[in-house]
């Protein structure tokens, strides 16, 4: 029987108290204030996924290993005489599944924003029947990351390979396949985090077959950890910039390819939507010499270069200059000012 996507409740007579009833006992003829409530069935169905930007070869973002699937298509046309139609919708899947489920959690659940942090990713397998097993772990990371160690059932292994693939750490341990329930996999890695609330989503896969990867479920994967989640919070940080660095305190733009330009490196923090970033060079009188950068950026590392010229393209005279790095956000402006010398 396919579960209904709605649950039905009637009032018990006690204000604010309801009891669940079958749909055929729900009296729709009553005034809504007496009839009860119809609620979304989040007990038997997962929540609706976010909308898909593209359907072509798109992996489902809903939980895996469910018997039934609901989907909703919204058709939009460009005018009154236009009509949108659907020819077909195809879902591809593999049988048997990789596992009944794989539970995962990350530690620590609080990390420094704007710094490379060390994390441990725990996974625990759940098998109850004939499943494929897996030998690959994918961990979605916000930036390129590095694996520093892998353990199977608390024993370190050296026979593994890893690489970055489509914004995910891909770790393969082909000679240590996971095929029984309760096995524990531990992946140690280092990753930059720039936004509080970053989710390190995970999947498991089988490198020895064409089975689709299977998503992990956040939960209690390690008895030694209490987080039971894949979301990492950021330590309190007031600034929007970190690791602001100049390539040199002095530049000599004379064409000899030695310190000809200034390289400004920085990490933008906490920007979950594009933020306007400006880099402007001033002289000591406060006049604008060069507008070097004016773009909308997301969180992460960035590099901006100034070649020692002004807005007209001419080489600036020797002296001391101020470089202003500024972010304009809904909460206000955040500014960093550093000095650089120009000499010949």
Roles of regions detected by a PLM:
Residues 1-95, 145, 293:
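Non-cytosolic beta-sandwich-type ligand-binding/adhesion modules
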Residues 47-60, 156-186:
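Extracellular adhesion/glycan-binding regions together with long Ser/Thr-
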Residues 138-156:
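Solvent-exposed beta-hairpin/edge-strand motifs
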Residues 89-112, 224-257:
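Short, compositionally biased P/S/T/A/G/V-rich stretches that sit at domain boundaries
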Residues 74-76, 190-192, 205-207, 309, ...:
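Beta-strand-rich extracellular modules
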Residues 72, 107-135, 266:
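Short beta-strand elements of extracellular/lumenal beta-sandwich folds
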Residues 73, 169-206:
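Low-complexity, intrinsically disordered segments enriched in Ser/Thr together with acidic residues
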Residues 232-344:
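Short loop/turn motifs at secondary-structure boundaries
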